[in-house]
Amino acid sequence: TTKGRKREHYQLNLDIIAEESVAAEAEVLFAAVSALRKMGVPDEAYRIRVSNRALLSELLLSLGVKEQFHQGAFIALDKKGKIPREQIEAILREEGLDDEACTAAFNLMDISSLEDAEKLAGEGSPAIKQIRELFALLDAYGIGNQAVFDISVIRGLSYYTGIVFEAFDTKGEFRAIFGGGRYDNLLSTIGGEAAPAVGLGFGDVVVGELIKALDLPSTEQNELVIIGYMADEQRVAATQLAARLRGEGKAVS
């Protein structure tokens, strides 16, 4: 195993189904930041890198790369920094890109700002608009300083369709703290009813290592209260009691 990766781990997930707007992305990211704050992790200890697969598709199309090759290009470009450039370009060629397109696609990963991306994609880019809307909502949540644009964030799984994101510690010591994005086609692909969706996942291992590295004090454990009832007519009273105790900050089951 490698640092931050175990043979067995717990993953915490949060998903929002049936919301098309980037309000869903903003909400799950705010929930993630809130959770890290609850654990005592300071905001300055990490940054959330945000991109949009739709933007990368727009840019690939502008280079003359046909849409049928985009998924393979995503998988290859996601390996930047993990394997040598020559191997990535070899994968791109296997996916049908010629030498010129391979070089151009790889160079897209050097785009350093949203403004530079917009110059290539054009001012009317729907993907750029989505990113700007997301950043505006993150500002409204008070976590705008946590997020930065990073076109190299692609995510290796093929089901992502739009906004994608990953959070990394600012010292660069660990794997991603959490990651996720939009997957509007996944539910229908696996046989369910079509619905837009956004989700993120936390791995407990990296979060635990980050907390240790920051030497954070143990957080207080909420008092756990278990409420039982013997008859259905007691359900209302039990529910009212549970609501009151939760309002006092207690964990209730």
Task: Describe the residue ranges of each PLM region.
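Short terminal or interdomain "cap/linker" segment that borders an active site or interface and mediates
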Residues: 46-89
